[in-house]
C-alpha cells in the first residue's frame, strides 16, 4: 500500500510447521520480481530513504538499488510474537528481499515500545523507500552509476 506498487501476493506455505519458510520465500519472490521489473535500472532514482512515525515508534529505511543484495536491520522488538506472527521473521523477510532484489537496505528503529508498531512502521518505511528509489526521474540519463551498470 505505501509503496504504491500494483501487486497482490498470495502465499501458501508450511505454516503448520511455522511461518519462517513462507515469509522468507515471499521475500525471495518479491525481491526477484523487483529485480526483474527494474531491468537495467535506466532512469531510476536509485537512492531513497523514509522515516515513519507511528505513535511512540520511529523507524527509518534507506535503500541503494546497487546490484549488491544486502540488508542491515536494527529492529529490537520487545516481544517474540504479535498475535501468531514470530516477530523475528520481519527481519528475515527484509534480508531475503534485499538479497534477491539485489539492493542494499538499511532498516533501523530509532524509537519504539510496541512490537506491532515497530514492525508495521518498518514495512511502511521500506515500502515508501522502494517507491521513491524505483521512480523514474526524467533528469537521470541512462543508468544511475559511474560504472554504467548496476
Segment roles from a protein language model:
Residues 1-150:
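Structural preference for solvent-exposed beta-strand-turn elements
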